A protein has these predicted regions:
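Short secondary-structure boundary/capping segments
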Residues: 26, 65-66, 120-122
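Zinc-dependent deaminase
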Residues: 1-19, 80, 87-154
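Helix-adjacent hinge/juxtasegments
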Residues: 50, 54-91
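Short beta-strand scaffold segments in enzyme catalytic cores
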Residues: 24-32
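Short beta->alpha transition motifs characteristic of CBS
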Residues: 35-42
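Residues at secondary-structure transition points
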Residues: 23, 43-51, 79, 125, ...
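Active-site phosphate/pyrophosphate-handling residues
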Residues: 4, 33, 55
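Small-residue (primarily alanine) positions within well-ordered alpha-helices
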Residues: 9, 13-16, 26, 52, ...
Length: 154
């Protein structure tokens, strides 16, 4: 745990607000050095996935030329939404540090509690309708993957 890393994540969140973005920033740390930074770019890029943490993860993976961030930590200006938390698991980040809480974010209209609630529901109960179709055709790609001898597992 390093206050300087968190200070940088917070600086990025403040800079983001001043530049028209959302109030979120993050840094990725490996071997006690910042290797990547990110701030919220949702509105500037018209990309709803361009959260500060996601941008930092993308930058770190690009810098390391690896999809795995094992051995890395992330410092975020806020407790993560489900999207960013999932990205941390998928990228294998070792540890998450955060400053503001989900409740702090909710108070300024960044409320993601409905997503946490939706994830726990059965597919048939979710607000966005989900319909399965063409499974047999789609399974062909899975069968090819399963038989592939040179696949890179992730």
């Amino acid at each position: 745990m390093n206050n300087e890393f968190m200070k940088r994540a917070i600086e990025l969140s403040i800079e983001s607000v001043k530049n028209g973005g959302g109030p979120f920033g993050a840094v990725i740390v490996k071997d006690d050095k910042i290797i990547a930074e990110g701030s919220n770019q949702v509105t500037s890029t018209n990309d709803p996935t361009a959260h500060g943490e996601i941008v930092a993860i993308r930058n770190a993976c690009k810098k390391l030329n690896d999809f795995s961030l094992s051995g890395c930590e992330i410092y975020s200006s806020c407790e993560m939404c489900p999207l960013c938390l999932a990205a941390c698991y998928w990228s294998r980040i070792d540890k998450i540090y955060y400053a503001n809480t989900r409740e702090d974010a909710r108070k300024i209209d960044f409320d993601d509690s409905f997503i946490y609630s939706e994830i726990n529901k059965n597919i048939s109960e979710r607000k966005i309708p989900m319909t399965q179709m063409m499974r047999d055709e789609a399974l062909k790609a899975f069968e090819l993957w399963d038989k592939k001898t040179d696949k890179v597992k992730y």
